[in-house]
A protein has these predicted regions:
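Nucleotide-activated donor-dependent transferases that construct or modify glycoconjugates
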Residues: 1-14
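Short amphipathic alpha-helix
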Residues: 15-28
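A short beta-strand-loop structural module common to alpha/beta enzyme folds
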Residues: 34-44
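Short acidic/histidine-rich motifs immediately flanking catalytic phosphotransfer sites
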Residues: 54-59
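Short His-centered aromatic/hydrophobic patch
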Residues: 62-68, 89
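Membrane-proximal helix-turn-helix segments that form the acceptor-binding/catalytic region
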Residues: 99-116
Length: 146
Protein backbone atom coordinates (compact mmCIF):
# COMPACT_ATOMS: atom_id res chain seq x y z
CA UNK A 1 0.00 0.00 0.00
CA UNK A 2 1.27 3.46 -0.85
CA UNK A 3 0.73 5.86 2.03
CA UNK A 4 1.07 9.64 1.91
CA UNK A 5 1.92 10.70 5.45
CA UNK A 6 1.25 14.40 6.06
CA UNK A 7 3.29 15.76 8.97
CA UNK A 8 3.25 19.41 10.03
CA UNK A 9 6.45 21.45 9.96
CA UNK A 10 9.07 18.74 9.65
CA UNK A 11 12.40 20.47 10.10
CA UNK A 12 15.31 20.71 12.49
CA UNK A 13 13.19 21.67 15.50
CA UNK A 14 10.78 18.78 16.02
CA UNK A 15 8.14 18.58 18.70
CA UNK A 16 6.86 15.36 20.27
CA UNK A 17 4.09 14.84 17.70
CA UNK A 18 6.51 15.20 14.79
CA UNK A 19 9.00 12.79 16.36
CA UNK A 20 6.27 10.22 17.07
CA UNK A 21 4.97 10.61 13.51
CA UNK A 22 8.39 9.91 12.05
CA UNK A 23 8.77 6.86 14.30
CA UNK A 24 5.39 5.62 13.06
CA UNK A 25 6.47 6.13 9.45
CA UNK A 26 9.60 4.06 10.11
CA UNK A 27 7.52 1.30 11.73
CA UNK A 28 5.19 1.21 8.72
CA UNK A 29 8.19 0.93 6.41
CA UNK A 30 9.52 -2.00 8.46
CA UNK A 31 6.19 -3.76 7.85
CA UNK A 32 6.66 -3.37 4.11
CA UNK A 33 4.47 -0.33 3.46
CA UNK A 34 5.57 2.36 1.04
CA UNK A 35 5.39 5.57 3.11
CA UNK A 36 6.27 9.02 1.79
CA UNK A 37 6.44 11.98 4.18
CA UNK A 38 4.71 15.16 3.04
CA UNK A 39 5.89 18.08 5.15
CA UNK A 40 3.08 20.58 5.67
CA UNK A 41 3.58 24.22 6.52
CA UNK A 42 1.36 27.28 6.42
CA UNK A 43 2.57 28.27 2.94
CA UNK A 44 0.90 25.16 1.52
CA UNK A 45 -2.49 26.62 2.41
CA UNK A 46 -2.02 29.03 -0.49
CA UNK A 47 -1.00 26.27 -2.91
CA UNK A 48 -4.30 25.04 -4.29
CA UNK A 49 -2.86 22.19 -6.36
CA UNK A 50 -0.87 20.32 -3.71
CA UNK A 51 -3.69 17.76 -3.53
CA UNK A 52 -2.64 16.43 -6.97
CA UNK A 53 0.42 14.81 -5.40
CA UNK A 54 -1.92 12.50 -3.49
CA UNK A 55 -3.35 10.87 -6.62
CA UNK A 56 -0.64 8.17 -6.68
CA UNK A 57 -1.34 6.99 -3.13
CA UNK A 58 -3.85 4.53 -1.68
CA UNK A 59 -4.20 6.24 1.68
CA UNK A 60 -3.62 9.66 3.22
CA UNK A 61 -2.38 9.47 6.81
CA UNK A 62 -2.44 12.78 8.68
CA UNK A 63 -0.44 13.17 11.86
CA UNK A 64 -2.81 15.44 13.75
CA UNK A 65 -6.32 16.85 13.44
CA UNK A 66 -5.16 20.40 12.82
CA UNK A 67 -4.66 22.79 9.94
CA UNK A 68 -3.14 20.14 7.66
CA UNK A 69 -6.09 17.82 8.21
CA UNK A 70 -8.63 20.58 7.57
CA UNK A 71 -6.76 21.64 4.42
CA UNK A 72 -6.78 18.20 2.78
CA UNK A 73 -10.29 17.47 4.08
CA UNK A 74 -11.62 20.38 2.04
CA UNK A 75 -10.26 18.76 -1.12
CA UNK A 76 -11.86 15.45 -0.16
CA UNK A 77 -15.20 17.09 0.58
CA UNK A 78 -15.05 18.82 -2.83
CA UNK A 79 -14.43 15.45 -4.49
CA UNK A 80 -10.93 16.34 -5.69
CA UNK A 81 -9.30 13.66 -3.51
CA UNK A 82 -10.96 10.25 -3.29
CA UNK A 83 -8.51 8.46 -1.03
CA UNK A 84 -8.92 6.85 2.37
CA UNK A 85 -8.29 9.49 5.06
CA UNK A 86 -6.80 8.33 8.34
CA UNK A 87 -5.94 10.85 11.07
CA UNK A 88 -4.01 10.30 14.27
CA UNK A 89 -4.98 12.27 17.36
CA UNK A 90 -2.47 12.71 20.14
CA UNK A 91 -5.08 14.38 22.34
CA UNK A 92 -4.35 18.10 22.22
CA UNK A 93 -6.48 18.63 19.12
CA UNK A 94 -9.50 16.68 20.39
CA UNK A 95 -9.42 18.00 23.95
CA UNK A 96 -9.06 21.69 23.00
CA UNK A 97 -12.70 22.75 23.39
CA UNK A 98 -12.02 26.42 24.13
CA UNK A 99 -9.71 27.11 21.19
CA UNK A 100 -11.99 28.41 18.44
CA UNK A 101 -9.46 27.86 15.67
CA UNK A 102 -8.92 24.20 16.56
CA UNK A 103 -12.69 23.75 16.87
CA UNK A 104 -13.04 25.13 13.33
CA UNK A 105 -10.40 22.69 12.05
CA UNK A 106 -12.24 19.83 13.79
CA UNK A 107 -15.57 20.79 12.21
CA UNK A 108 -14.01 20.99 8.73
CA UNK A 109 -12.11 17.71 9.11
CA UNK A 110 -14.72 15.55 10.82
CA UNK A 111 -16.83 14.56 7.75
CA UNK A 112 -13.78 13.68 5.64
CA UNK A 113 -11.95 11.45 8.13
CA UNK A 114 -12.61 7.77 7.46
CA UNK A 115 -10.74 6.53 10.54
CA UNK A 116 -9.50 8.45 13.57
CA UNK A 117 -6.75 6.69 15.49
CA UNK A 118 -6.30 7.84 19.08
CA UNK A 119 -3.24 7.08 21.19
CA UNK A 120 -4.97 7.14 24.60
CA UNK A 121 -7.98 4.97 25.47
CA UNK A 122 -9.78 7.89 27.15
CA UNK A 123 -9.75 9.81 23.85
CA UNK A 124 -12.24 7.39 22.28
CA UNK A 125 -15.09 8.81 24.37
CA UNK A 126 -13.93 12.40 23.84
CA UNK A 127 -13.67 11.96 20.06
CA UNK A 128 -17.08 10.30 19.79
CA UNK A 129 -18.65 13.08 21.83
CA UNK A 130 -17.13 15.58 19.37
CA UNK A 131 -18.84 13.81 16.47
CA UNK A 132 -16.20 11.47 15.04
CA UNK A 133 -17.82 8.20 13.95
CA UNK A 134 -15.05 5.68 13.31
CA UNK A 135 -12.67 6.08 16.27
CA UNK A 136 -10.20 3.41 17.26
CA UNK A 137 -7.70 3.20 20.08
CA UNK A 138 -4.70 1.30 18.83
CA UNK A 139 -1.80 0.37 21.10
CA UNK A 140 0.10 -0.71 17.98
CA UNK A 141 -0.70 2.08 15.50
CA UNK A 142 0.33 0.21 12.37
CA UNK A 143 -2.32 -2.48 12.90
CA UNK A 144 -5.16 0.05 12.37
CA UNK A 145 -4.24 0.90 8.82
CA UNK A 146 -6.33 -0.90 6.20
Amino acid sequence: MRIAFVVARVGEERNVIQRLSLVLADELRKQGENVDIFPFNRRKVFSFFSYKKLSNYDCVLISNVGLQCAYFSIFKRLGLVKKLFVAISFGSDIRATRNKLINLFNRISRPAIDLLIVVNPDLVVVAKSRGYKNVQYVPSWASALP
